[in-house]
Amino acid sequence: MAQKDVLTDLTKVRNIGIMAHIDAGKTTTTERILYYTGISYKIGEVHDGAATMDWMEQEQERGITITSAATTCFWNDNQINIIDTPGHVDFTVEVERSLRVLDGAVAVFDGKEGVEPQSEQVWRQADKYEVPRICFVNKMDKIGADFYFSVRTMQERLGANVIPIQLPVGSEGDFEGVVDLVEMKAKVWSTEAKLGEKYDVVGIPTDLQEKAEEYRTNLLETVAETDEALLEKYFSGEELTVAEIKGAIRKLTISSEAYPVLCGSAFKNKGVQPMLDAVIDYLPSPLDVPAAIGHVPGKEDEEIVRKPSTDEPLSALAFKVATHPFFGKLTYVRVYSGKVDSGSQVINATKGKKERLGKLFQMHSNKENPVETASAGHIYAVIGLKDTTTGDTLADPNNQIVLESMTFPDPVIEVAIEPKTKSDQEKLSLSIQKLAEEDPTFKVHLDSETGQTVIGGMGELHLDILVDRMRREFKVEANVGKPQVAYKETIRRVVETVEYTHKKQTGGSGQFAKVIIKLEPFSGENGATYEFENKVTGGRIPREYIPSVEAGARDAMQYGVLAGYPLVNLKVTLLDGAYHDVDSSEIAFKIAGSQVLKKAAAQAQPVILEPIMAVEVTTPEDYMGDVIGDLHSRRGQIQAMKERAGTRVVRAHVPLSEMFGYVGDLRSKTQGRANYSMVFNSYSEVPANVSKEIIAKATGE
């Protein structure tokens, strides 16, 4: 095993992801890959599925998905690191972060359904990061499975240039194997072969010969066009060698000009080994992908390039943080350049903090395999990093670099959460800290008015899952409020002078303060939302009381005059006032400052602001009218419409309050074929009729 810890020859390494729609059979495919790649050093341990079973049991026992972040396995002296990608809309964060560290991917499709909405969305995200892919049409043994239909949906729905390099032998219950169009041989799994470990290479069945010739001709024409010499050879009637064909397919795949398509049935153990061969033959090694680009810490315009070599200085990206039952915090990193030993000190260049690497592991299908050194091109799990979170760069302290991070949007939806008992309060704090480390899109703050803890996330499902994890993993008993939109208030008019006198006369010394202010709308630079200016002359208000007036005004801004939402974008100018030698005090001026601001704001035409989301809907042309009509009914403003690879993309600005439950409505309107993403865009004034409703709700009228 020792020589297999880390392969130093990077041409033999593949960092891949397996991406799929929820039910396309991703887990089974991953499981079978681990099973076959494990055979080489597990012979005798495998009793009809024992390997698969113990692997799942261990998952249940430990409560973590071992496949979740990165699993290392070996195939014909090559090393494959598999990074798992989830298949759900609200977890785009998970998908984005795994795609960021992949070099290539296997897209798994359901042989009966072809391209499904989720596969469409994950495919588009992979386009964004330009990840080379091969396609595996799975479940060929299913009733209704149709390889040719699946290939057609890839062309039509994904607009992808796909090239079948295999055809199925038999279908549904009679699915036996595949025709390899590169070698022009059939690979057939007989029912006797234990768990599909062996297959026979035979001649192509007569009923498939004509079809195989037709598809082979298409393949050869595509391949020949990649290279002048091949083109000449092909048209002069010479046979292209297997090595030449594979080399050309590899070139097309790595440049994302084409996507090879294979087929099989992971569940029935057919077609998995040729798919592993294709991963090695066609997907890029760390040396085939562009060098990592970053910048000098604090100077974003000074670019640095790091090649995937152990001779370069260290650069690594943390792409996931997970909690392990025995080791505590595990940070998964992709090393882009250089090498580093366990126990070394490195710098978190993103945060400017020193970190010490504790133990280093490579996750081998079902056990942690400790390694001494982490080197370029590989993926590791690290213990002992304290300040490092998702998206941070670890670098050599003497040669710092910040790699391009992943961008995570701010939360747009919030719920208040209230622990039931004192001990739950402590558990809640711990769970929030742990979840925030793992998930960069999960945010928390304390509502000063109600004293409640408010958590924010990317969508309703996202928050449901987070709350569920608090209950299950951290045993927090808590009451959870309804999702809320974060409104704000501001003013539209200048009020030249407003005065307020605070007087209180009880026995002994009283309280006295008089202030006069001007209030006006304000839009500061760099997002400043407030300004205070003092124009009092001649000591009409002693200097020591001025800060109290400002403090009072700022307090009053926490709760607006219409519905109690925070006031933003205003400028307060203190013009004049009066004081009393005996009765004036800091507290008197603070109260006066607070009251005068409320009085002025009420006269300055106050309005409510709401968060507006930039929404992007990707939909097939047939549903375009329904989608646009629906966005209009949600007070949406259409910004742009574009065509992208056979689908339509609609961009619109829509108030967040109108987007609750949108995912369900969109699915039912488009039979699940459209999907959407939304990010916060800006705050904007609420129309009068909506404003009335918000005020009525807030004031309980």
Swiss-Prot record:
InterPro entries, alphabetically?
A: EFG_II (IPR041095), EFG_III (IPR009022), EFG_III/V (IPR035647), EFG_IV (IPR047872), EFG_V (IPR035649), EFG_V-like (IPR000640), EFTu-like_2 (IPR004161), G_TR_CS (IPR031157)
UniProt-annotated location(s): Cytoplasm
Q: Where is the signal peptide?
A: none
Q: Tell me which UniProt keywords the record has, alphabetically.
A: Cytoplasm, Elongation factor, GTP-binding, Nucleotide-binding, Protein biosynthesis
GO MF terms here are:
GTP binding; GTPase activity; translation elongation factor activity
The domain of life for this entry's organism is Bacteria
Q: Which residues bind GTP?
A: 20-27, 84-88, 138-141
Q: Which GO terms describe its cellular component?
A: cytoplasm
tr-type G domain sequence ranges:
11-287
Q: Name one GO biological process term.
A: ribosome disassembly
Its job: Catalyzes the GTP-dependent ribosomal translocation step during translation elongation. During this step, the ribosome changes from the pre-translocational (PRE) to the post-translocational (POST) state as the newly formed A-site-bound peptidyl-tRNA and P-site-bound deacylated tRNA move to the P and E sites, respectively. Catalyzes the coordinated movement of the two tRNA molecules, the mRNA and conformational changes in the ribosome.
To which protein family does this belong? Belongs to the TRAFAC class translation factor GTPase superfamily. Classic translation factor GTPase family. EF-G/EF-2 subfamily.
What's the protein here called?
A: Elongation factor G
The organism encoding this protein is: Mycobacterium leprae (strain TN)
